[in-house]
């Protein structure tokens, strides 16, 4: 059986935009790198249920989001919604409200777009974050993530201010702040992933290489810290920046990618999700593992390396969480986002 996986990334060197690859799950093999959409710097991508592809996009001196029709093979460009400044770094679809959310790292903004009948987008709200953190990389707000909580609120992670903000989404796409969780100072809050029970979340810190385990109170939309754990071995003292974080759908294992140590940190998750136990690290066979993802059956993990331009394929043991190398050095340039179909 062959599965298709979409890839987004930078177009600074050789990449032309969004690509696809095929995963043969019987042979444990990636093949057929194919260009899907020509777009500048689609560093994060997402699909809605109707087959619309939304990507971060640069456009001349501006940045924003691009929309495409995608039939599984080819794309038709539906248009860009851009403004002055750098492009987004994260995009997510809200199917229930027919909205798309975007995070703008450089401008410190959260943006909301309404999906139109033809799949194109209309900007409905922009919220500017303010503040800073103690590290040089935190001179101002840097919103790095904007996606839904299990109960349908919007949650954002701000790498510049170490804050996780929960919003109610009102009407046709207006945001109203509910709560602000303040992570460890200098953490660099990047992404958050929720346990399948919806009551626990895992916040990854790019700048201090940690994961904070958080309880989530749905009634109040409030986070509280339960545990902090490192993503690195004790004997590693080199540079590192954590990137992606994913939890298996059964809630048993959590993974995070280390850029610098160039590894996936693997954790066993307690039955209620409230505690992580480190069970080791697997080297990713490339440089700067910016993103990774499960295939749709979660038998495999595909790791994308932004700097070494390769994908690595691991077989995943669902009972132990451990990873076995199946393929490395599959060429895919400047990839920063892995999206299984």
From Swiss-Prot:
One Pfam family hit: Lactonase
GO CC list: cytosol
Molecular function via GO: 6-phosphogluconolactonase activity
Origin: domain of life: Bacteria
InterPro entries associated with the record: Cycloisomerase_2, Haem_d1_sf, Lactonase_7-beta_prop, WD40/YVTN_repeat-like_dom_sf
Chain residue ranges for the region called Disordered: 125-146
Protein family according to the UniProt entry: Belongs to the cycloisomerase 2 family.
Protein name: Uncharacterized protein llmg_2431
Native organism: Lactococcus lactis subsp. cremoris (strain MG1363)
